[in-house]
């Protein structure tokens, strides 16, 4: 090869290598390539001085003959008599003859939340309307700011449900929250309704 072809070859190699450093191109790329080009390696040549979980092998002393300490293997029978019968009599005579509702035994919960359906059934709007109906007069008198914030939140959620989530309100009507059933002090079904007026 003559010197002209060699110099041309070196210039081509130089330009292609310089192009390799740039990740912008006038040629449109596929989406995957663009996402990869945006993720830059900023730790090239860096030596980590700590153990990387899942990357580095576990730290071991070289040429150490002492085995790694681990608990002795136990053969566990998951169907032994004690494990198989665990909790089988928990329900016997706990609630008596069935006249006491289980929600009335939830002494650790606030009175207005006892027996109330969870967020997966009755949403925040239903919960706040229930809370407002029970403590409306007390909140007005003792903490007007909290009462005002509660009304604002109910008003916002009511707008949200009326305009964006009408199907959810329909589902909640079928939960039995508004039906006339035997009441258990923790719910006031007669005063709670989705038609409640918001002032």
From Swiss-Prot:
Taxon lineage: Eukaryota, Metazoa, Ecdysozoa, Nematoda, Chromadorea
Family statement drawn from the similarity comment of this UniProt entry: Belongs to the mitochondrion-specific ribosomal protein mL51 family.
This protein's name: Large ribosomal subunit protein mL51
Swiss-Prot/TrEMBL keywords: Mitochondrion, Ribonucleoprotein, Ribosomal protein, Transit peptide
Gene: mrpl-51
Subcellular location: Mitochondrion
Any single GO BP term: translation
One MF term in the entry's GO annotations: structural constituent of ribosome
Xref: InterPro entries: Ribosomal_mL51 (IPR019373)
Record note on quaternary structure: Component of the mitochondrial ribosome large subunit (39S) which comprises a 16S rRNA and about 50 distinct proteins.
Organism: Caenorhabditis briggsae
GO cellular component, one term: mitochondrial large ribosomal subunit
């Amino acid at each position: 090869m003559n010197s002209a072809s060699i110099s041309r070859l070196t210039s081509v190699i130089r330009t292609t290598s310089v192009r390799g450093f740039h990740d912008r191109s006038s040629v449109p790329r596929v989406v995957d390539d663009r996402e990869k080009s945006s993720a830059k390696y900023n730790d090239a040549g860096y030596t980590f001085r700590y153990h990387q979980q899942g990357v580095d092998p576990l730290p071991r002393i070289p040429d150490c003959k002492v085995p790694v300490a681990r608990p002795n293997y136990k053969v566990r029978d998951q169907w032994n008599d004690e494990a198989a019968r665990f909790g089988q009599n928990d329900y016997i005579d706990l609630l008596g003859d069935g006249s006491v509702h289980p929600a009335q035994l939830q002494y650790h919960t606030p009175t207005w939340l006892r027996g109330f359906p969870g967020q997966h059934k009755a949403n925040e709007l239903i919960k706040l309307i229930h809370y407002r109906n029970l403590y409306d007069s007390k909140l007005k008198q003792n903490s007007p700011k909290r009462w005002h914030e509660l009304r604002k939140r109910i008003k916002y959620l009511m707008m949200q449900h009326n305009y964006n989530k009408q199907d959810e309100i329909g589902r909640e009507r079928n939960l039995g929250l508004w039906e006339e059933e035997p009441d258990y002090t923790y719910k006031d079904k007669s005063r709670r309704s989705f038609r409640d007026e918001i002032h």
